[in-house]
Curated annotation (Swiss-Prot):
Subunit record text: Found in a complex composed of MORF4L1, MRFAP1 and RB1. Interacts via its N-terminus with MORF4L1. Interacts with CSTB and MORF4L2.
Protein name, UniProt field: MORF4 family-associated protein 1
Organism whose genome encodes this protein: Homo sapiens (Human)
Entry GO CC: nucleoplasm; perinuclear region of cytoplasm
Keyword annotations from UniProtKB, A to Z: Coiled coil, Cytoplasm, Nucleus
Residue stretches in coiled coil: 92-126
Length: 127
């Protein structure tokens, strides 16, 4: 460290002092405006994210309705084939019934997976 020179201490630097209005306009106003823009941007993004999630939930709800309709149609078709085998042999009706049951199980699994996905999305929305 070097020792301080007395001459250096005797001559303070001149600092320009701004009027309060100039200080506000020059420094604070730009910061305030930038913060307002950031808040508006975050608010818009929050709204868009909410709408995206609601849209996904709506799509999944429609998929669940379609799956349920398909399961019901498969069950009804299998029951109709069992009740009215017509000229078909008993073995073919049993095979069709088994296939319908397998498809119904697959669709039920898909529906369960979709329900779980919807629950996860709802849980993440609430977090």
């Amino acid at each position: 460290m070097r020792p301080l020179d007395i001459v250096e201490l005797a001559e303070p630097e001149e600092v320009e002092v701004l009027e309060p209005e100039e200080d506000f306009e020059q420094f604070l106003l730009p910061v305030i405006n930038e913060m307002r823009e950031d808040i508006a941007s975050l608010t818009r993004e929050h709204g868009r994210a909410y709408l995206r999630n609601r849209s996904k939930l709506w799509e999944m709800d429609n998929m669940l309705i379609q799956i349920k309709t398909q399961v019901e149609a498969s069950e009804e078709s299998a029951l109709n084939h069992l009740q009215n085998p017509g000229d078909a042999a008993e073995g073919r009706a049993a095979k069709r019934c088994e296939k319908a049951e397998e498809k119904a199980k697959e669709i039920a699994k898909m529906a369960e997976m979709l329900v779980e996905l919807v629950r996860r999305i709802e849980k993440s929305e609430s977090s």
